[in-house]
C-alpha cells in the first residue's frame, strides 16, 4: 500500500499471479491470485487520485470444457484450482467496480521468447532445439487458441488507452490448433523427428481439451 501511494500510478496492468495450471500448492494459488489481487485493489482505492484504468488479467481457463467458439458471455465452468482462483478473482474484483475503473481480460493461451520451459510450447521447442529423441507430455488430445505474447501485449495497450469501463474482454486469435499440429510444425521447422510419450504423471484430471475464443 505504501509503495502504491509513492508511485501514484496513472494506469495499472496487474499480471502478477500463479499462472501454471499444474502448480502444486493450491493454498498459494488462491493466496496470490485472489487475496493478492484484493490487496492491490484496496491500495489503489485508497489513492487520492484514481488511476485512469486498472487492467486485471483473468484467464480463458475459466470457461473450462465449453464447446464451440467462446465469447465473453459463455458460461464459466472452471476445471482446476487455477481456473477457480481466476473466477473468484473476477467476482472479488466486481466488489470494487464502483470505486475503481476496472478492465478484465481473459487471455487464451499465449507464448513467446523467455517463457519458462514448464509451459507447453517452450517445452516442445526446447526439446527440438536440444535434439532430444523423446518428449514426455500429458494429455495429447488437446487443442488451444495459441497467441503470440506480443499480440497480447498490444491488446492490453489498446484496452488501457480506452479507460476502465468495467467490461470483460477475451484476448484471442479466434483460431484453434491441436497439440499434434504444433509437434508437426516443429518437425518441419527443425528437420528432426521426436517420439511423443504420454507420462501419466503429467495427465491432469478434468483436462481442458479445447479452447477457442471469439475475437469478433
Residue ranges of model-derived segments:
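NAD(P)H-binding glycine-rich loop region in Rossmannoid oxidoreductase-like domains
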Residues: 1-32
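Active-site beta-alpha turn of Rossmann-fold NAD(P)-dependent dehydrogenases/reductases
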Residues: 16, 55-58, 79, 106-108, ...
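Hydrophobic positions on the long internal alpha-helix
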Residues: 36, 40-44, 92-93, 155, ...
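Short-chain dehydrogenase/reductase
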Residues: 28-34, 74, 78-90, 115-122, ...
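Conserved Rossmann-fold NAD(P)-dependent oxidoreductase catalytic core, especially the SDR/UDP-sugar
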Residues: 14, 38-81
Amino acid at each position: 500500500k505504501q509503495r502504491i501511494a509513492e508511485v501514484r500510478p496513472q494506469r495499472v496492468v496487474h499480471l502478477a499471479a500463479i499462472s501454471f495450471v499444474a502448480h502444486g500448492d493450491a493454498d498459494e494459488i488462491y493466496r496470490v491470485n485472489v487475496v493478492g489481487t484484493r490487496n492491490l485493489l484496496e491500495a489503489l482505492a485508497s489513492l487520492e487520485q484514481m488511476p485512469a484504468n486498472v487492467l486485471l488479467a483473468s484467464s480463458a481457463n475459466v470457461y473450462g470444457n465449453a464447446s464451440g467458439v467462446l465469447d465473453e458471455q459463455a458460461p464459466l465452468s472452471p476445471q482446476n484450482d487455477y481456473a477457480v482462483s481466476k473466477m473468484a478473482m473476477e467476482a472479488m474484483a466486481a466488489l470494487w467496480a464502483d470505486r475503481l475503473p476496472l478492465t478484465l481480460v481473459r487471455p487464451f493461451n499465449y507464448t513467446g521468447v523467455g517463457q519458462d520451459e514448464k509451459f507447453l510450447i517452450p517445452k516442445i521447442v526446447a526439446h527440438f532445439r536440444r535434439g532430444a529423441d523423446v518428449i514426455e507430455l500429458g494429455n495429447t488430445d488437446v487443442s488451444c487458441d495459441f497467441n503470440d505474447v506480443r499480440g497480447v501485449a498490444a491488446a492490453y495497450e489498446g484496452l488501457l488507452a480506452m479507460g476502465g469501463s468495467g467490461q470483460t474482454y477475451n484476448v484471442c486469435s479466434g483460431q484453434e490448433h491441436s497439440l499434434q499440429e504444433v509437434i508437426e510444425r516443429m518437425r518441419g521447422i527443425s528437420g528432426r523427428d521426436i517420439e511423443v510419450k504420454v507420462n501419466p504423471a503429467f495427465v491432469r484430471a478434468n483436462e481442458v481439451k479445447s479452447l477457442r475464443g471469439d475475437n469478433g
